[in-house]
UniProtKB/Swiss-Prot annotation:
Entry's Gene Ontology BP terms: S-adenosylmethionine biosynthetic process
Keyword Zinc: yes
Lineage, broadest ranks: Archaea, Methanobacteriati, Methanobacteriota, Stenosarchaea group, Methanomicrobia
Claim: Metal-binding is one of the keywords in the record: yes
Protein name stated in the entry: 5'-deoxyadenosine deaminase
Pathway assigned to this chain's UniProt record: Amino-acid biosynthesis; S-adenosyl-L-methionine biosynthesis
Residues that bind substrate: 108, 200, 230, 316
Organism: Methanospirillum hungatei JF-1 (strain ATCC 27890 / DSM 864 / NBRC 100397 / JF-1)
Root EC class: hydrolase
Name of the gene: dadD
C-alpha cells in the first residue's frame, strides 16, 4: 500500500511518529469517483482530485497507494463514556434505573484515575480500529482520560460528569473539577483535545445547578454535554416536579444553546423538537444503547429533521452498548428509525453517513467530517476486498448497511497515521493493561473477577 521508497515494512514504527506530508493516490470516494488526496505536515488537506499525484509526488514524504481502498471521513462519536470499556459485560439485561443504582454507580464509586486511564486507552484503541477519530466524552478523572487521549492521537471533547441531586457542597466540588479540567486541557496546547461542562441530566442536576453550568459554558465558550429525555419516566417526573418537559427545563435554566450536545432524546415531543431547533442544539442519537436499555421509543428523527435540528450519532458507554463501533451504530440508527416509525424511507444511507461524520463535527464545534481542500486530514481507508464491501454498486449504501469495524484498514487523524494495514503500535500492551485494570476495579469493589 505504501511507496517502497518511504515505508517498506507495514509495521515500520516511523510511520506513526508524526504528521508528514502525505499523498494518497487513486483512492475511491463515496461518490464513486477516483481521486488523489494530498495533505501537508500540518494535517490539512491541500488538494484532492484526479491526477494530483503527477504534480505533487515529489513533495510528499509518504505515498500511500489507495487503489484498493475507499476513502471516507473519520467517524465522530458525539456521546460516550469512554472508560466504561472496563465495565463491558458487567451488568446486562436490567431496567435502566436498577442498572444505574444497583450496578453501575456502586462500582464507579471504586474508580481511580488509573482505571480511567486504561479504560480510555482501550476505548481509543477500539475506536481507532473501527474508524472513529473523534469523540465526546463524559466521565470522571478526566485528566487521566486526557493523558490517554493525547497518547492515542485522536480528537476528544472531555467533560467531568456533574451529578449533585441538589447538594450545594457537591456542586461546588463538581464545578471545581470542571474548572480544573478546562485549565488542564488548555495547558496541553493541542487543538485535538477540548473540554466541556457536563450536567448529567435534569433528573440528577436541579435547576439552580443547571443555571451554574449554563453560566460557566457561556463564560468559557465551551460545550454543554448532557442527557435529555432518555426515558418516559424522566419526562413524567420532570412534568410532575417542575410542570414542564426536561427540554423546557434545560431551556429555562439557559442550558439549551448552539453549544449544547444533548444525548438520546427518545421521548422528545414535537414542541421540544421545535425548541431545540430554535436554540440550535445538536442531538446525539444512541440507538444501540436505547434499544438495549429498552427506553421504549426511538428518538423522533423525523420531527427533528423537519425542524432543522442537527442530529449526530453516539454509541453511549460500553456498559450499555457494548462496543464503540460507529459503523454498526450507523446501520442500527437507520434501521431503528425505519422500524419504529414505520417508514422505509426515513434516515436513508446518505443521512446516516452524515450523522456519523459532518453533522458530528458540527456538533463538536469544528470544521471537518468531509474530505475536501482546507479541511483536517481525518481520513479512513476502507478495504474494498473485504467481503462485506463486495459488490460495490453503491459505496454509501455499503458503508451504512453492510460495513462494520473490520473493514477499516487505515486511520488518519489531523494527518497523523494512527492505524496502517490494521496495525496499531502498542495494541497488546494496551489490552493487557486494560484487562488488569478491570480486574483491579472489581477487586476493589469486593467482586470476584
Amino acid at each position: 500500500m505504501a511507496d517502497p521508497k518511504d515505508i517498506s515494512p507495514c509495521k515500520n514504527e516511523d510511520l506513526f511518529l508524526k504528521c508528514r506530508s502525505t499523498l494518497i493516490t487513486g483512492v475511491l470516494l463515496p461518490d464513486k469517483t477516483r481521486s488523489d488526496i494530498w495533505y501537508d505536515e500540518t494535517g490539512t488537506i491541500r488538494t484532492c482530485g484526479p491526477d494530483i499525484a503527477r504534480n505533487h509526488r515529489n513533495e510528499a514524504d509518504i505515498i500511500l497507494d489507495g487503489s484498493g481502498f475507499l476513502a471516507m471521513p473519520g467517524l465522530i462519536n458525539t456521546h460516550t463514556h469512554a472508560a466504561m470499556t472496563l465495565l463491558r459485560g458487567y451488568a446486562d439485561d436490567m431496567h435502566l434505573q436498577q442498572w444505574l443504582s444497583e450496578k453501575i454507580w456502586p462500582l464507579e464509586a471504586h474508580l481511580t484515575g488509573e482505571h480511567v486511564y486504561w479504560g480510555t486507552k482501550l476505548a481509543c484503541l477500539e475506536m481507532i480500529r473501527s474508524g472513529t477519530i473523534a469523540f465526546n466524552d463524559m466521565y470522571f478523572y478526566m485528566k487521566d482520560a486526557a493523558r490517554a487521549v493525547q497518547e492515542s492521537g485522536i480528537r476528544a471533547v472531555l467533560s467531568h460528569g456533574i451529578i449533585t441531586f441538589g447538594d450545594e457542597a457537591k456542586m461546588e466540588a463538581e464545578l471545581k473539577a470542571t474548572e480544573d479540567l478546562v485549565h488542564h486541557v488548555r495547558s496541553l496546547n493541542t487543538s485535538l483535545i477540548t473540554s466541556a461542562i457536563a450536567p448529567h441530566a435534569p433528573y440528577t442536576v436541579p435547576p439552580q445547578h443547571l443555571e451554574v453550568c449554563a453560566d460557566y459554558s457561556q463564560k468559557e465558550k465551551i460545550i454543554i454535554h448532557t442527557h435529555l429525555a432518555e426515558t418516559k419516566q424522566e419526562v413524567d417526573d420532570c412534568q410532575k416536579s417542575y410542570g414542564m418537559t426536561p427540554a423546557a427545563l434545560l431551556d429555562k435554566t439557559g442550558c439549551l444553546t448552539e453549544r449544547t450536545v444533548a444525548a438520546h432524546g427518545c421521548w422528545l415531543s414535537e414542541d421540544d423538537c421545535r425548541l431545540l431547533a430554535e436554540r440550535r442544539v445538536s442531538v446525539a442519537h444512541n440507538p444501540v444503547s436505547n434499544m438495549k436499555l429498552a427506553t421504549g421509543r426511538a428518538m423522533p428523527y423525523h420531527w427533528l429533521k423537519d425542524q432543522g435540528v442537527n442530529v449526530c450519532l453516539g454509541t453511549d458507554g460500553c456498559s450499555s452498548n457494548n462496543n464503540l463501533d460507529m459503523l454498526e451504530e450507523m446501520k442500527t440508527a437507520a434501521l431503528c428509525q425505519k422500524f419504529f416509525w414505520n417508514s422505509d424511507t426515513l434516515l436513508p444511507a446518505a443521512e446516516a453517513l452524515s450523522m456519523g461524520t459532518s453533522w458530528g463535527a458540527k456538533a463538536l464545534g469544528y470544521q471537518g467530517g468531509v474530505i475536501q481542500e482546507g479541511m483536517p486530514a481525518d481520513i479512513v481507508l476502507i478495504s474494498l476486498s473485504h467481503p462485506s464491501m463486495v459488490p460495490l454498486h453503491n459505496p454509501v449504501s455499503n458503508i451504512a448497511y453492510s460495513a462494520e469495524g473490520s473493514v477499516v484498514d487505515t486511520v488518519i487523524c489531523q494527518g497523523k497515521i494512527l492505524m496502517y494495514n490494521r496495525y496499531i503500535p502498542d495494541e497488546e500492551k494496551i489490552i493487557a493493561g486494560a484487562r488488569e485494570s478491570a480486574d483491579d476495579l472489581l477487586n476493589r469493589a469486593g467482586i470476584m473477577a
